[in-house]
Regions:
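Short alpha-helical Gxxx[C/S/T] motif in the catalytic ATP-binding
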Residues: 7, 198-202
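Short beta-strand-loop-beta element adjacent to the nucleotide/active-site pocket used for signaling
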Residues: 142-164
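Histidine phosphotransfer helical core of two-component systems
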Residues: 2-52, 58, 68-72, 92-99, ...
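Short helix N-cap motif at coil->helix boundaries in the Bergerat
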Residues: 77, 172-180, 194
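A conserved beta-strand-to-alpha-helix junction within the catalytic ATP-binding
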Residues: 37-44, 71-86, 104
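Conserved catalytic submotifs in the C-terminal HATPase_c
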Residues: 98-112
């Protein structure tokens, strides 16, 4: 959901609670006053949290609008994918020194160059790889025996299209939410950790290139996101 809806809803609730608070103070019901005050504080924390999420969404959208030149150019997809894979890994390691995963690359050397907006497709790759790292990192926290976090990044040519696949052996995506993952503001991450715009923007970017994003997932075993781009865009 749009985090501003939460901000508005909790603000409305607090207005009512504060009216009740005034009445209870007049009556001298200080036990009830304490209870209402606690509810108001709890709601303020939620407002603060969702407000920060809204802020990060706006910043992300502004960053995206500034970063994209909109100019397509012949781009080496293997080199671009490798560059953003390294960026994702080192960016995460800078924030979390304990993160570790086996990373495998399977690049099709015959891929050649295709016409894309490199910053935009790079943003898509970065988002998918960050999501894969998050998925395996969360599964590793479960301390399962012999679990080895693994992310595979693969490129290949398939039926006149270039495919970029990001595969993880995390917990997969439940069937109940698979249809929602490309919706704006939808996120499975804890409040404050995800904007819910990453996959939505990725979907729009790929669609603007005449391509599509597909997902295959098995709950408990992992997910594969496949970006398909036309060779002659």
């Amino acid at each position: 959901q749009n985090p501003l809806n939460f901000v508005n809803n909790f603000s409305d609730v607090n207005k009512e609670l504060l009216s009740e608070l005034k009445e209870e103070i007049k009556k001298g019901n200080y036990g009830e006053v304490q209870s209402i005050a606690k509810d108001v504080i709890d709601n303020e924390e939620k407002i603060n949290c969702h407000g920060k999420r809204a802020d990060s969404i706006v910043k992300g959208m502004l960053q995206h609008s500034r970063a994209s030149s909109g100019q397509k150019e012949l781009t080496d997809i293997n080199a671009l994918t490798d560059e953003y894979l390294r960026l994702a890994y080192h960016g995460l390691r800078a924030k979390d020194k304990s993160f570790n995963a086996e990373i495998k690359t399977e690049f099709d050397s015959s891929l050649g160059k295709i016409n894309v907006v490199p910053q935009d497709i790079g943003r898509v790759i970065l988002n998918l790889i960050n999501n894969a790292f998050y998925a395996v990192g969360e599964k590793e926290k479960e301390n399962l025996n012999a679990y080895q976090p693994t992310v595979i990044v693969r490129t290949k040519r398939n039926n006149g299209k270039v495919e970029i696949s990001v595969i993880d052996n995390g917990n997969g995506i439940p069937d109940s939410i698979r249809e929602k993952i490309f919706q704006p503001f939808f996120t499975t991450k804890p409040t404050g950790q995800g904007t819910g715009l990453g996959l939505s923007l990725a979907y729009d970017i790929v669609k603007a290139h005449g391509g599509e994003v597909k997902v295959q997932s098995k709950e408990g075993e992992g997910s594969e996101f496949i970006v398909q781009l036309p060779v002659n865009a």
